[in-house]
Amino acid sequence: MRAQRGVALLLVLWTLATLSLLLGGLAGWVQLENRQAAWQRQHTQALLAAQAGVSLALQAVLDTRHRPRWMADGRVVPLAFDDAQLEVSVSSERGKLDLNAASAEDLIRVAQACGAERGQALRLSRALQARLANGATPLRVIEELRQLPGMTQTLYARMAPHVTLWSGLSRPDAAFASPLLRGALGLPSQTNAGGHDADAGSVLSIDSRAQLPGGVVAGLQTTVLLSPSEGNAQPYRVLRWQE
């Protein structure tokens, strides 16, 4: 009888221990789900704030009465939206190297300025020139650059901010070119190139970064084609959108 009672007690204790482990695991899972849901909610709020930064920049660019005029030279402008702190910049695509129009030598120079070795830059340039020379469809999205021989993830990350598909220029407009491009291609300084008086064109890139009080950050990069209209039509068309 005592042996049976001992076995029964062990079974009860084992059951209680198992239930405790299950309940502990369930509680931990619920806490993890709650943290993930809270982070997702805050990240969505930060992303919406970043989108608001894009809208504010577009409004300033399109409104000819806006003073001071928002220059498309890549400078970072601090803004506030509700509780979020924003950092927004506008860049003209005219100041970037057009992959579909640039010369082979210019592409090599820019790739090397971004850290590529000479041989790596040559492979990249030859692959792009061969594609364009054979009558294939020109690059339609910047991400296609990743597929070319000689391209690495590190090199792509360095080159992407300095290249475009929408300027149509054989060389970047020095008035809007980055210091890296001006140095690599021997372009004149922004002051000598016209600076604030230069035409930024109709294709702009907007980079918006939002940070909430809790530290959650979200970023948004978009390229838009401006099409000012006095009617109800949207005054711009999105060419590229990356969160």
Feature locations, PLM:
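Compositionally biased linear targeting/interaction segments
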Residues: V7-E243
